[in-house]
Structure formats: C-alpha cells, structure tokens
Regions:
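Positively charged, low-complexity terminal tracts
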Residues: 1-139
Length: 139
C-alpha cells in the first residue's frame, strides 16, 4: 500500500485599497532592505530560509501596487499562506518596535502607528486585522 502526499496550497483573498497596497509594498520593501544581511546568508548558516523568504517578498511586491495613480482602485488580491505570513511578520515587527519605543520615550509621534496599548492603528491596523481574519478563517 502506498501513501500519497497531497500538497495543499492555501490561498487567501484580501480586498485592499490603493493606500493599503502601497503601505504593504513600502513595509515589505523596507523590511527587506533593513534585514539584507539575513537574506544574504547561506541557507545552511541561517535560522529560517532566507532565499525562500526573499522570493516571497519579491512575489508580494509584484502583487501589490507600489504607487497610487489615477487608475488605482481597490482590488481583491490572492496571497499564498506563506506570503500572508511574511506580511503578518513585517507588521508584527513594526508593532513591537513602535510599542517598545512608546513605552520608553512616551513619544506621541509613535501614537500615529500604535495606540497606548501597543496595538497597530490606522492603515497598519486595518491591514493587520484583515490578515489575521483571513488566517483565522473569519470573513
């Protein structure tokens, strides 16, 4: 008796405004830039899969609009589960950074990104909520 391995690729549809698309592009590109040393590592030296993560980042950048034009519109974009987790991790890292700096310095400018409890707000919070709902199966 032979066992068959079935590969299940989970896909998630997110309805994103032009602003949300540009924000995702900006955040993922910035994350890629500031973590370049991780992406430059050999697979056997790194924790994780730098080349795979970098490939996913390029795919995300290809899916969303990088700038708003007069033709920009809200679109439903289909992401793979791995792509969605990359965006989730990028936003979670932003949330952790801004909440920790607000806790230390009480800088009101940080409150444009996180609330006093340290949760993402504004466009970042909207995107983060959509991703968490998609991953958790809530529509």
């Amino acid at each position: 008796m032979t066992a068959q391995l079935e590969l299940v690729l989970r896909k998630y549809d997110l309805e994103l405004t032009p602003d949300e698309q540009v924000t995702i592009w900006d955040e993922v590109a910035f994350y890629h830039e500031v973590n370049q040393s991780y992406f430059d590592q050999d697979e056997d030296e790194a924790l994780g899969s730098p080349q795979e993560d970098e490939r996913l980042i390029y795919e995300i950048e290809d899916l969303v609009d990088s700038c708003i034009t007069k033709e920009s519109k809200t679109r439903t974009i289909t992401f793979s589960e791995d792509q969605l987790w990359i965006i989730h991790d990028v936003l979670r890292e932003k949330e952790e950074l801004y909440s920790s700096t607000y806790d230390r310095y009480q800088d009101e400018d940080d409150l444009e990104v996180v609330d006093k409890e340290g949760n993402l707000i504004g466009i970042w919070g909207d995107i983060y909520k959509k991703i968490k709902e998609a991953i958790n199966g809530q529509h």
